[in-house]
Amino acid sequence: MRYTFSDEKKATTTTTSRAKSQARLLNSASYRRAARTTLRHSYGMGMWRAVALLACLSATHAALFTEGGAVQNGKDNKANKYVEFAHDDKINKEDLLKYYGKEVEQYKDDDSYMEYLIEYMKSHPVPAQFPNFEQEAEQEHQDELNQWLEQLMNEQELLEPANAAVKDAEQKAPLAPVHHKQVAQKPAQEPFDLDDLLRGELMLENEIAKESELKKTQEKLSEQTPSAKANVESLESAMQTATGEPQVPQKKGQNEFVSFVEQEPQPAKQTISSQTVDKRRLATSAEYSGSAPRYSSSSLLLLAVGTVMCVGLIGTVAGGTYYYKNNRRTETPDDGEYAPYAGTGPGFRKNKGNKGDETLAYKAQLHQYQQAKQKIICGEDAPGIIESDGEDGADEENNYSVYECPGLAPTGDIEVCNPNFAAQP
C-alpha cells in the first residue's frame, strides 16, 4: 500500500508541474510575438489560391498572345490547325493502305503483275539518261576543233583575193631572161582532212607532255644535294683522267653516228685490259666512297653506352665469383691447422707418405682391445695374452716395436671409492 500511494502522489505532482509550465509559456512575450507574426489559416489558403490563379492566367497568355501562340497576326485558329493536320494525315494513311492493299491483291499472280508493269511503262515514258561527263568532254573538244577549222577556212577565203592580185601582177610582169631556170610551181593545196588534223594535234600534245616531263626531271636534278653534285664531278674528273678526253655532253644518237662514220683504231689487248682495269678501279673506289657507312652521333653514342655496359657486367660477374670463393676459404677451416699441434687430423694424413707407422699403431690398439675383451669374458685376474688371427701373427712375426709390460698389477686388487655412492644401501 505504501508503494501505490507514493506512485499516485508522484503522478499528481508531475501533472501539476506540466500545467504550470504550459501556463508560463502562454503568458510569455515570445509566444505572443509568434502568434502575431504567423498568418491565419484562412488567410494562407486564400493566398495560395491567388497564386494558382495567376499561374493559370500567365499560361493562357503565353499560349494565346506570344509568338508561338494562337492569336498572332490574324491567325485565330492556329492551335486547332495541328489537330486538323494530324487528322488529315491519319485519313490519308488509311486511304493509301486501302488503295495499295487492293492493288497488291489484284496483282498477286506473275502474269498479271507483268501485264501491270508493261502498262505502267507504256503510260510513263522512260526518263532521260544520266549525263555522261566523258562524252561531254569529248564533245566540247570536238566543238573547239570545229571552231578552229572554221576560222582557218575563213582566213583562207579572206586571203584568196590577195593571192589572185599577186598572180595577176606576176603575169603582167616582163618575162625573165633565158639563163634563169624556171621555178617549179607548187601544186594546188588539197582540202584539209579532219582525221589528219586530229592526229597532228595529238602528236603535238604528246610532244608537249614529253617536254614538260623533261623539264620536271631537269628541275629535280638541279635540286639535288651538293654532295651528289660533288660525286658526279669527281666521277667525271676520274673518267677524264682515265680516258684523257673531256666528257662533253652529246646529243641523242651522236655517239652511234661518230662510231659508225669515224671508226677509232682499236688498241692492243694489253692496253685495253689496262684501261678497263683503271676505269673499274676508279668506279669501284668512287662507289665505295659513296656507299661507305657513315655513323651519326646518335649511333656512336649508343655503341659507346653498349660497350661500357658490357664491360661493367663482365667485371661485376668476375668480382662476385672471386669474392664468393675467397669468403668460403676464410670461413672453412684450413687443413694445415692440425699439422703443427699433433700428428692427427686430415693434414697429417694427407702430407705423410709412409704408412708403416699407421699400420703399427692400428695393430697395437687392436691387440690391446682384444686382450681387454678376453679378460672380461673369462674373468681371469692375471693378464693373458690372446693370440690374434693368422694374418696378424704373420705380420707381427718380424715386428719387435710393440712389447707387453709384465710389471702391471692385476686389476682385481684395485678398489675404487666413489664418494657419490654409499658403501651400504
Swiss-Prot record:
Region (AEX-3-binding): 205-424
Keywords: Membrane, Transmembrane, Transmembrane helix
Signal sequence region: none
Regions of compositional bias (Basic and acidic residues) in chain numbering: 1-11
InterPro entries attached to this UniProt entry: NPDC1
Membrane topology qualifier: Single-pass membrane protein
Region of interest (Disordered), residue spans: 1-20, 214-251, 334-355
Superkingdom field: Eukaryota
Subcellular location: Membrane
Subunit description: Binds to the RAB3 GDP/GTP exchange factor aex-3.
Native source organism of the sequence: Caenorhabditis elegans
PANTHER family (UniProt xref): NEURAL PROLIFERATION DIFFERENTIATION AND CONTROL PROTEIN 1, NEURAL PROLIFERATION DIFFERENTIATION AND CONTROL PROTEIN-1 NPDC-1 PROTEIN
Protein name: Protein cab-1
GO cellular component terms attached to this protein's record: membrane; synapse
The organism's taxonomic lineage, starting at the top: Eukaryota, Metazoa, Ecdysozoa, Nematoda, Chromadorea
Family: Belongs to the NPDC1/cab-1 family.
BP terms from Gene Ontology: chemical synaptic transmission; positive regulation of anterior/posterior axon guidance; ventral cord development
Reported tissue expression: Expressed in a variety of neurons.
Transmembrane region(s): 300-320
